[in-house]
């Protein structure tokens, strides 16, 4: 099916600001459209199914994530239009086993759509076994569901940089998109 890039991006382009994100997303859409033409179906790229939205509050990260999920759905990259937004309190318990169960539940709800983890750096704040377990479980579930799950981690730039640097596996598997204060 031929994809009309302008139509796919129309909702995003109607928003004020987000200029750097719009340029980045246009490139991502080009990659998926080119892969679709080459392979006959929207070939998926892990690089664009694991994203970090780094920016201050009010820069449009949550809004952009919702729109991106819709675009990925239209491209056939994701099978459903689900958008699940969670934060640390939804995931981490004082017990590792309960933390793993909460993360599995969140991924299960989001499968086929977007799992948006706001203030993601707080997953590693207290350096407990449960916090480390949360990250390890999330990484394992991302691998297991890599073809039908968009995971977006969001946070302040300085906190996100520290978070990604705290775990080599995190840093290597996420593509970072910066949201500037002048976006709105």
Predicted regions and their residues:
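Conserved nucleotide-binding/hydrolysis micro-motifs of P-loop NTPases
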Residues: 59, 90-92, 121-123, 156-161, ...
């Amino acid at each position: 099916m031929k994809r009309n890039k302008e139509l796919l991006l129309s909702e995003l382009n109607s928003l004020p600001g987000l200029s750097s994100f719009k340029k980045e997303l246009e490139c991502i859409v080009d990659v998926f459209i080119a892969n679709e033409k080459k392979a006959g179906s929207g070939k998926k790229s892990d690089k664009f199914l694991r994203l970090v939205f780094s920016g201050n509050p009010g820069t449009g990260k949550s809004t952009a994530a919702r729109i991106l999920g819709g675009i990925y759905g239209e491209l056939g990259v994701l099978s459903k239009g689900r958008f699940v937004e969670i934060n640390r309190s939804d995931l981490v318990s004082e017990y590792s086993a309960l933390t793993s169960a909460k993360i599995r539940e969140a991924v299960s709800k989001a499968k086929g759509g977007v799992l948006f983890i706001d203030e993601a750096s707080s997953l590693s704040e207290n350096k407990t076994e449960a916090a480390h377990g949360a990250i390890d479980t999330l990484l394992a579930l991302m691998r297991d569901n890599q073809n039908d799950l968009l995971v977006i981690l969001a946070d302040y730039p300085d906190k996100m940089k520290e978070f990604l640097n705290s775990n080599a596996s995190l840093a290597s598997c996420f593509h970072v998109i910066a949201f500037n204060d002048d976006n709105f």
